[in-house]
Amino acid sequence: SPETIDLCLGYSNGLNAYIEDHGLIEDDIYPISGKDIIAGTMHKTPFFFQLPLFLGDLYFKKPSEIPPYYKRSDEIEKIKGSNVYALSPKITDKGNTILGINSHQPFEGELAWYEAHINSKEGWNMIGGLFPGSPVVLVGHNENLGWGHTVNRPDILDIYELEVNPNDENQYKFNGKWEDFESFEVIIKIKTIGKLKHKHKQMAYWSKHGPVIKGVNSTYAVRYSNMNNLLAIEQWYKMNKANNFKDWKNAIETLSVPMFNTGYADKEGNIYYVYGAKTPKRNTKYDWQKVLPGNTSETLWSEYELFENLPQVLNPESGFIQNCNSTPFQTTIGPENPSSENFNSNYGIETHMTNRALRAIETIGKDKKISYDEFINYKFDLNYSDNSIMAFLVKRAISILNENNKSEFDIDLKNQIINTLTKWNLSTERNNIYATLPIIAFNPLLDNSEDEIYDDLIIKRLVYASEYLLKHYNKIDVKWGDVNRIIRGDLNLPLDGGPDIARAIYYKEYKNGQKKAIAGDCYVLIANWNKNGKVSSQSIHQYG
């Protein structure tokens, strides 16, 4: 729309003014245009449905080696996660409506959140989180309503193997005929030393499906939802300016943003959840989790399922909704939960529950009257659920060690490990001396299902964790906060929380046996509408 174009132009003009005022002019990026802002959004969105990981593999791997999706152990996946909660007046002690927005992104870099409060005096009054380059707030609230997103994993990306003409590498077979690839030359600028850049010319190819990757083992094409849709910023802009649920829902129904779980609350006491997915209408005779044949129009989709057919929950009797990168089929408690039986398996909808989602159900879901302070405590909950993968791993490890007569550990160390695991109460409080060993051991396995975890792998991880702690601390019962650290400049402080905890912390190796927090609870905003509809909110950044 003209309004969105003006918005992007105004934002780019502001960036250019900043560049000029601060003497930061770089010929490669200056001047920034409104088109650059739109292109940036189109470039960043596919990061959330794993396109960069697929592209990296397509150059080298065979079709049978391409996974249907990537797990959190993969580097990009470690940074993605979020929690969103909404509580209606039915379960709050003062009849207020609470929205909890809790994004898990990197603490630093281009995908780190920053906060802005925009008040145009012309009907746009919004506060929340956004990424550098975004002209709109992506998660947050205005006077009347608010929302948060969490990353979901709908199947909105397909990979095709193309049959290339053995006599002409610039043709591929489609419906029995040889079709020419569209081709054009692109110039790629490669940074070398300092500000020096090398210009590399490369031919780019396109099939009826989308962009083509000529790999070592095969030639692939990629197709994903909204590949040519420029309207993501417009959708978010309309959500920013909406004054009521109807207007807001009209904006999100466009699905110009092709994914994300979204939790919503407003001053009228409405709460709402939707599993956002611009899901293609696909031929059910094919397995869409695998690489597809690109030689037939049967696999070439062009239409999408309707928004009204997505999993969603509006004003449940339980008075709350949550999503913590988990299945939409346990959004709340009670009969209003969507049923998996009503949705096509081609949608790729998740069925798993993260620990964060389990704990939300176990805390918020069991409390009939919740104060604001109690909600804050639930949001910063430090425990693994008894039904979590972590709890399963600990129980299984104890059982294996009690049954195992192998010599991975000497008898004293084996007994120490059993004692540590047995005494752990599943808390990640910083002074807990029993948490450190199992967290270091089992963190890489938390995205696995129980049937993917083998006894030998559990023992291997315990060997690693015990050797790590003995090397750096000369014992295995180390305070979790001595290892789990937040580091900023000269400050180096102990942290509560951990992987897949409501108070989420993800880390990397630092030094002297410490782990440096690099992602997790990076932006937390709690919006609170009182029973008269007046809003107040609190927010905090990862560094305070």
Task: Walk through the language-model features, giving the residues of each.
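Acidic, low-complexity N-terminal propeptides/linkers enriched in Ser/Thr/Asp/Gly that mediate export
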Residues: 3-100, 105-106, 267-272, 278-281, ...
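Proteins synthesized as precursors that undergo proteolytic processing into mature forms
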Residues: 234-260, 267, 340-396
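Hydrophobic alpha-helical segments
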Residues: 257-367, 428, 441, 446
